[in-house]
UniProtKB/Swiss-Prot annotation:
The modification Phosphoserine is found at S474. This is Cysteine-rich receptor-like protein kinase 37. The modification Phosphothreonine is found at T510. It comes from the Eukaryota. The active site is at D470 (proton acceptor). Keywords: ATP-binding, Glycoprotein, Kinase, Membrane, Nucleotide-binding, Phosphoprotein, Receptor, Repeat, Serine/threonine-protein kinase, Signal, Transferase, Transmembrane, Transmembrane helix.
Length: 646
């Protein structure tokens, strides 16, 4: 019975694969499920301006369009070979777009890395229903070998193999060494003199959003693919979504016009790239022994070293596991590893600073990027915030909450290790006139919805009930796709599920985002988080900082909620809306007005009239006409005489 189920399942998967993988041809693959009309419209919209966008952005461009759904949102990545001519690049992309439309009329994903008809330029185009930005993508892959055999051209295949491997290694090292001055930073073209032939040409390129280590890995996979499957051919190309490799006995893409020839390399006894023979005819027996025996010895040494390194890393990186009272575990990191990862907490690695310490970027030995929060020594409440955040984030998992990877409490250090979020925090965008232009209404709406989902999880959907107590723009991190992640749970409070509010004698947080009942009396609830959400929402709509507004209009001591409320009731809506926000085909002016309405409902002085985060998310997700309560006056706050922490 078990075997029958396995066979049936395997056959079903095969049928599904044959159904979804509709087209494969020289450097071109269509795959995935069939898309709907909205997905097709989004794809057409992105394709319409893609060639010009690639050229105007230095040869590499990525974008996404559509509602935040795998069924509607399209992500596209495109690039040209470095050193391209602008018109040749545009023409190449225009051709591949037309091919994509005709050969992939209904499928959600496509990948191609092709050349124009004259072999003058290469370009790559990929679209998917998920973001690939910054991710190593090895599949699908295509291999296009030269149909002719190389055996007839070389008498000594062993010598050719050694020289070929040396050339490939040199090209690979150069391509995977990032040149930060160029958008197309991972690239190398080499022209090498061989003993038995005048020139051999090799070219490698990676998409520029990879790490150097991932670029190198991708290119090695391409080289190994060719060696395993088509060794003995007179050249060929291997392409993957993240990288491309080609070698030939003649120049191509006009990539070698200004490349200086490298003299024939000295013979090598071994290589870091494994060499595979195509068949017995390609090598004589003695030559096989020359190549294979050293390779096997090196492989054994390599495996032993890797095993030893892995054992060492398992003890070095994580030397303990922290168990919370509820049986949850959290990784404890070694201090020496964190010091190394952050370059001894150098200024170059510093990302920012908060009330309880500084945040640094780090890179683990595995290549994983991390964010390291180092709590300030002598900060008074640092120890409490440290323990609070570890205990809470150990038990919370949500796409809109920052992920805590582990901690370190070695010696007198208290350190938290998070996933690295590349686009920093929301305040770096919303309060900067240049960066704010990136925040189209589509992006702003996505961020607002994401923060609301994160709060809903904290307030209602997790096993706990948590009040954040310090929700603000600087505590909203943005990933590579500008999706928000709520961060900084050091001040959060844990409630039992039947509790609805609490009171504290130690008021902590950021003035301007605090609900009036919390700032004045220390009373907090889910509705105090809603108030903070409302202030942040109004900041995103207006592009104005609550603090900056106070300084600009100091005489009136008018905060942002009051500023928006007055103009709302007077009908002066244009003064509320950020003039730098780019228009959107998806978000109408009515949607923007709805956002203002929701923001004002959140910052009402009467706690009972503020909506729950569940209601807010319901309103945000309904794009038809909806009925919402009429907002009542907001809290008119003046700076209190009390000091925070009373």
């Amino acid at each position: 019975m078990g075997k029958s189920c396995v066979v049936t399942s395997s056959f079903s998967l095969l049928l599904l694969f044959l159904q979804t993988l509709k087209y494969v041809h020289a450097g071109f693959i269509c795959y995935g499920d069939f898309f709907n009309v909205n997905y097709g419209v989004s794809r057409t919209y992105l394709f319409s301006s893609l060639p010009s966008n690639v050229v105007s952005n230095g040869g590499f461009y990525n974008a996404s369009f559509g509602r935040d759904s795998k069924n509607n949102r399209v992500h596209v990545v495109a690039l040209c070979r470095r050193g391209y001519e602008k018109q040749a690049c545009k023409t190449c992309l225009e051709h591949v777009i037309e091919d994509t439309k005709s050969k992939c009329p209904r499928q959600k994903e496509s990948f191609s890395w092709v050349t124009d008809e004259f072999d003058d330029v290469s370009c790559s185009l990929r679209y998917t229903n998920h973001s690939t930005l910054g991710k190593l993508e090895l599949l699908p892959n295509t291999i296009n070998p030269n149909p002719n055999s190389i055996d007839s051209k070389f008498n000594n295949m062993a010598m050719f193999s050694q020289e070929w491997i040396a050339m490939v290694n040199r090209t690979l090292e150069a391509a995977s060494t990032a040149e930060n001055s160029s958008v197309l930073k991972y690239y190398s073209a080499t022209r090498t003199e061989f003993t038995q032939i005048s020139d051999v040409y090799a070219l490698m390129q990676c998409v520029p959003d990879l790490s150097p280590g991932n670029c190198k890995r991708c290119l090695r996979e391409c080289v190994n693919d060719f060696q395993k499957q088509f060794w003995g051919r007179q050249g060929g190309g291997v392409s993957r979504p993240s990288c491309y490799f080609r070698w030939d006995l003649y120049p191509y893409y006009r990539a070698f016009d200004n490349v200086v020839r490298v003299p024939a390399p000295p013979p090598q006894a071994s290589s870091t790239i494994i060499d595979y023979g195509r068949d017995e005819k390609s090598f004589q027996g003695s030559n096989i022994a020359i190549i294979v025996v050293p390779s096997v010895i090196n492989l054994i040494i390599f495996v032993v070293l890797i095993f030893s390194w892995k054992r060492k890393q398992s003890h070095t990186i994580i030397n303990d596991v922290f168990d919370s009272n509820n049986g949850q575990s959290m990784l404890r990191f070694d201090l020496r590893m964190i010091v190394t990862a952050t370059n001894n907490f150098s200024l170059e690695n510093k990302l920012g600073q908060g009330g309880f310490g500084s945040v640094y970027k780090g890179i683990l030995p595995s290549g994983q990027e991390i964010a390291v929060k180092r709590l300030r020594k002598g900060s008074g409440q640092g120890g409490m915030e440290f323990k609070n955040e570890v205990l809470l984030l150990t038990r919370l998992q949500h796409r809109n909450l920052v992920k805590l990877l582990g901690f370190c409490n070695e010696k007198d250090e208290e350190i938290l290790v998070y996933e690295f979020v590349p686009n920093s925090s929301l305040d770096h965008f919303i309060f900067d006139e240049e960066k704010r232009r990136v925040l189209t209404w589509d992006v702003r709406y996505t961020i607002i919805e994401g923060v609301a989902r994160g709060l809903l999880y904290l307030h209602e959907d997790s096993q706990l009930r948590i009040i954040h107590r310090d929700l603000k723009a600087s505590n909203i991190l943005l990933d590579a796709e500008m999706n928000p992640k709520v961060a900084d749970f050091g001040m959060a409070r844990l409630f039992d599920m039947d509790e609805t509010r609490g009171q504290t004698s130690r008021v902590v947080g950021t003035y301007g985002y605090m609900a009036p009942e919390y700032a004045t009396y220390g009373q907090f609830s889910t509705k105090s988080d809603v108030y903070s959400f409302g202030v942040m929402l109004l900041e995103m709509i207006s592009g104005k900082s609550n603090k900056k507004l106070e300084k600009e209009e100091e005489e009136e001591e008018e905060e942002l909620p009051a500023f928006v409320w007055k103009r709302w009731i007077e009908g002066r809506f244009a003064e509320i809306i950020d003039p730098l926000a780019a228009p959107s085909n998806n978000i109408s002016i009515n949607e923007v007005m709805k956002l203002i309405h929701i923001g004002l409902l959140c910052v009402q002085e009467d706690i009972s009239k503020r909506p729950s985060i569940n209601s807010i998310l319901f309103w945000l997700e309904r794009h038809a006409t909806i009925t919402m309560p009429v907002p009542t006056p907001v809290a008119y706050l003046t700076r209190p005489s009390l000091s925070l922490g009373h």
